[in-house]
Amino acid sequence: MEALLSIFVESVFVKNMALAYFLGMCTFLAISKKIDAAIGLGIAVVVVLTITVPVNNLMFNYLLADGALAWAGLEGVDLSFLGLICYIGVIAAIVQIMEMVLDKYFPALYGALGVFLPLITVNCAILGAALLMVQREYTFSESVVFGVGSGVGWAFAIVALAGIREKLKYSDVPEGLRGLGITFITVGLMSLGFMSFGGIAL
């Protein structure tokens, strides 16, 4: 249990997807203009990461890894070179299924998140989480916690940036830095702040 808690805290603060690895920066910068939009996208990312990381873990361990097909009588087969394209396929399929389920059973939630769901398919933080999970050789339970933690960390970062950007609208920012200029500086300072968590022994 302590190991799972360590993975969660580490993925939220120490190894934050947005502020430590700089993954998902396209949507991170584009959707962080308003807090409401940032919260919507953050929730969608948490849900998608919570589902896709464990599913990709199962697929890697039972289909792609070296010797994973021993249950089918194919012991010497190693399909790990297909990992990247398979993870992308799983992410796209799960996002599409999620979109259809929300549209049919939760139309109000679909109306709120509908714009963000297609953006998640091409969010590199989702793919990055799957690749990091394989690289770190997480078990299924660890991959679930890592998926949730990575999503929460990314959502926390985008909501924090959106709050700062809303305050910056009323600040006297030099003309040359308005827009993305001051946003890049802000993200850099946020990232420096999150680096302080690197000293935590987990």
UniProtKB/Swiss-Prot annotation:
A GO cellular component annotation in the UniProt record: Gram-negative-bacterium-type cell wall
Transmembrane segments: 11-31, 35-55, 81-101, 114-134, 144-164, 182-202
UniProt-annotated location(s): Cell inner membrane
Endpoints of the signal sequence: none
Keyword Cell inner membrane applies: yes
InterPro entries per the UniProt record, alphabetical: NqrDE/RnfAE, NqrDE/RnfAE_oxidrdctase, NqrE
GO MF annotations, alphabetized: oxidoreductase activity, acting on NAD(P)H, quinone or similar compound as acceptor
GO biological process, one term: sodium ion transport
Group of enzyme by EC: translocase
Membrane topology: Multi-pass membrane protein
UniProt-listed Enzyme Commission number(s): 7.2.1.1
UniProtKB keywords: Cell inner membrane, Cell membrane, Ion transport, Membrane, NAD, Sodium, Sodium transport, Translocase, Transmembrane, Transmembrane helix, Transport, Ubiquinone
Catalytic activity: a ubiquinone + n Na(+)(in) + NADH + H(+) = a ubiquinol + n Na(+)(out) + NAD(+)
Family (UniProt): Belongs to the NqrDE/RnfAE family.
Cross-referenced HAMAP family: NqrE
Function: NQR complex catalyzes the reduction of ubiquinone-1 to ubiquinol by two successive reactions, coupled with the transport of Na(+) ions from the cytoplasm to the periplasm. NqrA to NqrE are probably involved in the second step, the conversion of ubisemiquinone to ubiquinol.
Subunit-structure text: Composed of six subunits; NqrA, NqrB, NqrC, NqrD, NqrE and NqrF.
Name the record gives this protein: Na(+)-translocating NADH-quinone reductase subunit E
Organism: Saccharophagus degradans (strain 2-40 / ATCC 43961 / DSM 17024)
